[in-house]
Amino acid sequence: GDLVVVQQARSAADGEMVVAMVAEEVTLKRIYREGASQVRLQPANPALAPILIPAREVEVQGVVVGLLRRY
């Protein structure tokens, strides 16, 4: 599989790929703010549905800054 390089961070700009803690689980998704209190976590796979949740339930752990792909 691929390896991602993550820079530790507590916040991220809209559209950045983040490592986020949601309900005590870690996920890798693009983050988008939907209004003042909602966040959309968008998977890279278009076949999967985005996650819409209150912003207070998402804790950004880091921002993806690189990708190592094995061929």
Region spans (language model):
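Acidic/glycine-rich C-terminal interaction modules and beta/coil loop segments
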Residues: 2-71
